[in-house]
């Protein structure tokens, strides 16, 4: 289970850059996995601060993204995993933009909303933006947008 934030300010989206398993940098929403015993609400506050330097206030729960990922273990056995990602809307209340030190991301930046489609990004960015724009009452998009 993980929690992520959609932070839009002055027509720009806050994103963090991470490197995927193939060594390719991609933009993602700030956020990440829950620590044992942690509430998802607290997870998103902690993760946004760790990855961007900003303190945020959660202004709403946009939805839940459920995904299934099938990979192979290092012993070539199939591994079938399911994950849940809670996507919150948040606004910056303090702090200063800075990169994460010693973590999973190496850069944080604001991107104009109209340039996001041209970025190398993970599918969660599109899912999060669709939840933000459409605000489905169920917290679920009508059609699955991404796998991971």
Where are the language model's segments positioned?
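Conserved N-terminal beta-strand and adjoining loop/helix that marks the start
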Residues: 1-14, 33-36, 87-89
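Short connector loops at helix/strand junctions that flank enzyme active sites
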Residues: 8, 22-24, 29, 56, ...
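Structural motif
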Residues: 13, 59, 81-87, 108
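General beta-strand recognition
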Residues: 14-15, 98
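Nudix hydrolase/Nudix homology domain
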Residues: 22-24, 97-148
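The catalytic Nudix box helix
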Residues: 29-62, 88
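Active-site-adjacent beta-strand/loop module that shapes the phosphate/pyrophosphate-binding cleft
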Residues: 67-97
């Amino acid at each position: 289970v993980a929690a992520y934030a959609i932070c839009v300010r002055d027509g720009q989206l806050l994103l963090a850059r991470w490197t995927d398993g193939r060594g390719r940098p991609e933009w993602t929403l700030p956020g990440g996995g829950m620590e044992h015993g942690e509430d998802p609400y607290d997870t998103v506050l902690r993760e946004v601060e760790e990855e961007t330097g900003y303190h945020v206030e959660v202004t709403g729960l946009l939805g839940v993204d459920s995904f299934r990922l099938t990979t192979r273990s290092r012993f070539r056995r199939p591994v079938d995993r399911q994950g849940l990602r809670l996507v919150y809307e948040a606004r910056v209340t303090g702090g200063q933009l800075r990169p994460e030190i010693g973590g999973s991301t190496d850069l944080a930046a604001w991107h104009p909303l109209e340039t996001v489609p041209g970025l190398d990004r993970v599918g969660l960015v599109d899912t999060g933006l669709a939840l933000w724009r459409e605000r489905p009452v169920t917290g679920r998009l009508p059609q699955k947008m991404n796998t991971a």
